[in-house]
Amino acid sequence: NRLLKQLYARKIIDNSTYELAISEPLPDEPHPLPQTAPHLVSRFYQERNGKYSISTIDRGIQTQIENAAERWSNEFNRSDIRNLAILVIDIRTNQVVAYCGNVNFERKQAGNQVDVIQAPRSTGSILKPFLYYAMLQEGSLLPHTLLPDIPVNINGFTPQNFSLQFEGAVPASEALARSLNIPAVTMLQRYGVPKFHTFLRQIGLKTINRPASHYGLSLILGGAEATLWDVTNAYAYMGRSLLQLPQTECSLLLADAEGS
């Protein structure tokens, strides 16, 4: 209203315009802009230099995973875990249908603007299914093959299960389902670290880029780093292989936007 009064005093607006303007209610505070897949938007901006892009994201699935991320973030905050990411790939089309690089994008103090999908993190136990897959494919392992879950010492390396217990003879399928460490280590010893290292590189785990000897048997227990992007694509590789689908490169863009 002060501005309107000044405009009227300087005869920039007439009296009727002034009276009509001050009688208008003040507008409400503008709604915040939607923050759908903000980390993906940032990725497109960096990789495509702001070029017009049409993503493969499914809005419904994206909304579901963002809600799930927010819900689990509230749970993890109790354990002082501030960052998480979710990536969903449709293995039949090999398109990314949901991309949540982190939670609370607007919060800078907890590193929430970091796209965790592209950030290397410890592999933990996430490589175990790849070892089982590789051994199943070559016929050196069956789901019911009994594996030893007993105390072992391999050149001074003594792996332990999370429970600190030993189960004796365990079927391979159960050892995988329970993520038992000792069977995984003995399997890797039998399969060969260099061979497994090569396989992981072949299926796209690019950040496992040091010699196999650098990792040793700890490779199967989190002794390496990988990105969620590479790991999810590698899991999609296994899924497509089992469904006998062609192995194509994962896409974030619709084909008709590639040349735009």
Please provide the spans of the model-predicted regions.
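Peptidoglycan glycan-strand catalytic modules in the bacterial/periplasmic cell-wall system
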Residues: 1-12, 104-107, 174-181, 189-192, ...
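Non-catalytic, structured segments within soluble enzyme domains
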Residues: 1-63, 160, 201, 205-212, ...
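Extracytoplasmic/secreted proteins, especially bacterial periplasmic and envelope-associated proteins
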Residues: 2-6, 39, 43, 52, ...
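Active-site SXXK
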Residues: 7, 65, 94, 114-147, ...
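Conserved catalytic neighborhood of penicillin-recognizing serine enzymes
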Residues: 30-46, 141-196, 240, 244, ...
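Flexible glycine/proline-enriched surface loops and loop-helix/loop-strand junctions
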Residues: 47-50, 111-117, 167-169, 177-184, ...
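A penicillin-recognizing enzyme superfamily signal
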Residues: 55-76, 88-90, 99, 107-116, ...
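Short loop/turn motifs at secondary-structure junctions and domain boundaries
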Residues: 76-82
